[in-house]
Amino acid sequence: PTPSPEARVASRPFLDSPLPGSPRSGSPTGYITATKAISAGKLEHVAEKFSNFYNEIELEKQQRRMADAARFQMLTDSIAKLEKSLEAEIKRRAESDKQIQVHFESEVKGLQERTALQLADLQAAFKTSVDGLSRTMQDLHTIIKEEREQRRSDIEHLAGSLVNKVNECVAALDEERISRMDAESKILKQIATDVFRVQEKIDTEKGTREAELATLRSEIHEVLGNRNLSDEKFQTLVLDEINNLKSAVQMEREERISEDDEIVQAVNDYTRALQDGLRIVNNS
């Protein structure tokens, strides 16, 4: 596992006290430790932002699934209501047809009874009337049957159209979900790549600093081996080297802080751009 920034800083072999004889000698532990702590805090802040951004994406996905389920349920309820209405209409028409048939049969029976009581010379006329009424009933029966078949055909066509629309809606929802998951996976992959690049840059800088410290340590040991120099020259050289090292450490500290600020700003800008892009996609 990759060590934390604090662990990496704590494990670096710095000298506890300034040693003479080198332009890089001094006590940079405090400055570099503080710089690493600031960098670690900023990286933790960036990681927290990425975590919040991922949680927002998951919450939005869950809300969209719930909305899709609610729409599907509403459509199912509408189809059920329509089927109930169609069944009620068919039942009502069947009862109406039965009542009409009973009514006309009673009328025919009444006419037949009244015809039997009439005079013999009116029997032919009554028979003609009854035959005409029978033909009318047959025609009406045929019309009702044709209308019933037409109604059934219309209902089947409407039900088929509704099923096709439901299938189209489900296919569109699946396609949208797949495209959204692809986009989210690409975004997460890009974020992981950027974080890896930042970590790689930090590791490279760590190796450079350790090499410089090794060089500084060797130079200090060489100076310790030449103690035959005069005290005055030695003191002057040590003071000059300490001042130079302090200036170099201060410049390096400022450069590291500036680089860390640029890295954090770039990551923040990239995060905002991703959020704006996702917001535009969702609104569209």
Swiss-Prot record:
Coiled coil segments of this chain: 56-102, 239-268
KW Electron transport (keyword) present: no
Residues covered by region (Rod): 39-284
InterPro entries xrefs: SF_assemblin/giardin_b
Pfam families from the UniProt entry: SF-assemblin
Post-translational modification: Consists of at least four isoforms including two phosphorylated.
Signal peptide: none
Region (Nonhelical region): 1-38
Keywords carried by this UniProt record: Coiled coil, Cytoplasm, Cytoskeleton, Microtubule, Phosphoprotein
Span list, region Disordered: 1-30
Cellular localization per UniProt: Cytoplasm, Cytoskeleton
GO molecular function, a single term: structural constituent of cytoskeleton
Compositional bias (Low complexity): 17-30
A GO cellular-component term linked to this record: microtubule
Family: Belongs to the SF-assemblin family.
Function field: Major component of the striated microtubule-associated fibers (SMAFs; system-I-fibers).
Free-text note on domains in this protein's UniProt record: Consists of a small non-helical N-terminal domain and a rod domain with a 29 residue repeat pattern based on four heptads followed by a skip residue. This alpha-helical protein is characterized by the ability to form a special segmented coiled coil and to assemble into striated fibers of 2 nm protofilaments.
Name of this chain's protein: SF-assemblin
